[in-house]
Amino acid sequence: MFLVGSLVVLCGLLAHSTAQLAGLPLPLGQGPPLPLNQGPPLPLNQGQLLPLAQGLPLAVSPALPSNPTDLLAGKFTDALSGGLLSGGLLGILENIPLLDVIKSGGGNSNGLVGGLLGKLTSSVPLLNNILDIKITDPQLLELGLVQSPDGHRLYVTIPLGLTLNVNMPVVGSLLQLAVKLNITAEVLAVKDNQGRIHLVLGDCTHSPGSLKISLLNGVTPVQSFLDNLTGILTKVLPELIQGKVCPLVNGILSGLDVTLVHNIAELLIHGLQFVIKV
């Protein structure tokens, strides 16, 4: 009986202690276990919680490569631009003896330009007083590239810009004209007798209507003089510049990287379309 009574007293004391402890706060880290994946948030920078999306690095899908034909077209135009510049195109344009060509009628005093100049100088005496016409500040602008509808040819647009300094004492100061002209070169792929593939130059000429001449600065001359001078330049300049650019393009094509030539030629021979930005 004494043993049973002692157990009853002990159980009562334990129940009383448990009731008292239930009202006290639990020590840090001794809380009841939480369900899986619901752990307490971690503190970050003055109590801010770290969002789940910023907690772990996310896998990033690799970027898709560009279309190979886009890269091929860019490499081709870059090679042409670099070849024209390294071939001295800008210096060649600056050294064109434009006044001598105009006065000689393009090397043929009996030709169209020579006859035209003779008529103009007789009707507009100011043209006789031209002391010099100098090409300055030649620029090679960004090349354009398109493919023929059948896929067998490329057409390269070579845009040029330059300034003409016209020295005329009668006018009273230097007259400057801004000139823009596009040369268009046709490129084809051919196979020789040994089966080797080459890129060759087809037609190469100035684009009709692409020549633009405008008064840049200087004393405004008599309008008839400006019109007649522009008319002469329109007859002379395109063929002069074309004669300098086209041989350079032909030489560049023959010296292009073999792999680049092969890749482009294969597409042209089979008529496969490039993805080319105009």
UniProtKB/Swiss-Prot annotation:
Known function: Lipid-binding protein which shows high specificity for the surfactant phospholipid dipalmitoylphosphatidylcholine (DPPC). Plays a role in the innate immune responses of the upper airways. Reduces the surface tension in secretions from airway epithelia and inhibits the formation of biofilm by pathogenic Gram-negative bacteria, such as P.aeruginosa and K.pneumoniae. Negatively regulates proteolytic cleavage of SCNN1G, an event that is required for activation of the epithelial sodium channel (ENaC), and thereby contributes to airway surface liquid homeostasis and proper clearance of mucus.
Per-repeat ranges for Repeat: 23-28, 30-36, 39-44, 47-52
InterPro entries associated with the record: Bactericidal_perm-incr_a/b_dom, BPI_fold-superfamily_member, Lipid-bd_serum_glycop_N
Family the UniProt entry places it in: Belongs to the BPI/LBP/Plunc superfamily. Plunc family.
GO terms assigned for molecular function: lipid binding
Disulfide bonds: C204-C246
Keywords per UniProt: Antibiotic, Antimicrobial, Disulfide bond, Glycoprotein, Immunity, Innate immunity, Lipid-binding, Repeat, Secreted, Signal
Stretch list, region Important for surfactant activity and antibacterial properties: 112-117
Organism: Mus musculus
Expression sites by tissue: Detected in airway epithelia (trachea and lung) and in bronchoalveolar fluid (at protein level). Upper airways, nasopharyngeal epithelium and thymus. Highest expression in the trachea and progressive decrease from proximal (bronchial) to distal (bronchiolar) airways. No expression is detected in the terminal bronchioles, respiratory bronchioles or lung alveoli.
Gene3D superfamilies: Bactericidal permeability-increasing protein, domain 1
Segments for region (4 X 6 AA repeats of G-[LPQ]-[PL]-L-P-L): 23-52
Locations listed in the record: Secreted
GO process annotations (BP): antibacterial humoral response; innate immune response; multicellular organismal-level water homeostasis; negative regulation of single-species biofilm formation in or on host organism; regulation of sodium ion transmembrane transport; surfactant homeostasis
Protein name: BPI fold-containing family A member 1
Signal peptide coordinates: 1-19
Transmembrane recorded as keyword: no
GO cellular component labels: extracellular region; extracellular space
Known glycosylation sites: N182, N228
SUPFAM superfamilies per record: Bactericidal permeability-increasing protein, BPI
